[in-house]
Regions:
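Hydrophobic/aromatic beta-strand elements that line small-molecule binding cavities or substrate pockets
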Residues: 21-23, 36-37, 55-56, 77-78, ...
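Ligand-binding loop in jelly-roll beta-barrel domains
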Residues: 28, 84-110
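Short acidic (Asp/Glu) patches
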Residues: 19, 40-42, 83-86
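Conserved short histidine dyad/triad with adjacent acidic residue
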Residues: 35-49
Length: 154
C-alpha cells in the first residue's frame, strides 16, 4: 500500500451498497480500517451494535444517524461517531445517493463487509455466521426500526 490512496483505488465490493475498502487492518497493524460507501436514496441500515468505534464522514448528501436514543442529521462535511456497543442506525435522507467514509477503530470489521458482499442473496445463515465472527449484532426487532421507517418514509 502506498502512502496515497487514489479516488479509484481500493477493493470494490458488490452488494446492496457500493462499498470500497480503502485501508485494511494489515495496512495499519490493526489500528484502523477505512471504507467508502454509497448509501442509496431512502436506504436504511438496520439498527445494530458492534465491538468497534466507527467515525463517519459525510462526503456528499445527507444522512440521518441514530445513536442510542438520539437522532441527528449529518450533511456533507459533517462527522458522526457510532460508538462501540451502542445501538445505532443510518439512513439516506435525500433523493440522491449519499457518499460517506467510515473509519473503523480498531480495524477488523472491514472483513465483515468483504464476507457479506460475497454471499448469495438470501444466505441468512452465512450472514449470521459472518456477524457472529465479527461481533456485529443486528436488531430488527428494535422499536427504532419502525419509528425511523415511519418518520422518514424509508
Amino acid at each position: 500500500m502506498s502512502f496515497v490512496i487514489g479516488p479509484s483505488e481500493g477493493r470494490q465490493l458488490g452488494g446492496k451498497f457500493e462499498v470500497v475498502v480503502k485501508v485494511r487492518s494489515e495496512h495499519t497493524g490493526g489500528v484502523m480500517a477505512v471504507i467508502e460507501e454509497i448509501i442509496p436514496p431512502g436506504a436504511l441500515i438496520t439498527p445494530h451494535t458492534h465491538q468497534n468505534d466507527v467515525w463517519v464522514h459525510v462526503l456528499t448528501g445527507e444522512i440521518g444517524v441514530l445513536v442510542g436514543d438520539e437522532i441527528a442529521l449529518a450533511a456533507a462535511g459533517a462527522w458522526a461517531l457510532k460508538p462501540r456497543n451502542v445501538l445505532h442506525a443510518m439512513w439516506n435522507t435525500q433523493t440522491a445517493p449519499a457518499r460517506i467514509i467510515e473509519v473503523l477503530t480498531p480495524a477488523g470489521s472491514e472483513r465483515w463487509f468483504e464476507e457479506t458482499a460475497e454471499l448469495q442473496p438470501g444466505d441468512e445463515e452465512g450472514f449470521r455466521a459472518s456477524c457472529q465472527r465479527h461481533g456485529i449484532q443486528f436488531h430488527p426487532d428494535s422499536p427504532w426500526l419502525r419509528t425511523l421507517k415511519e418518520r422518514y418514509g424509508l
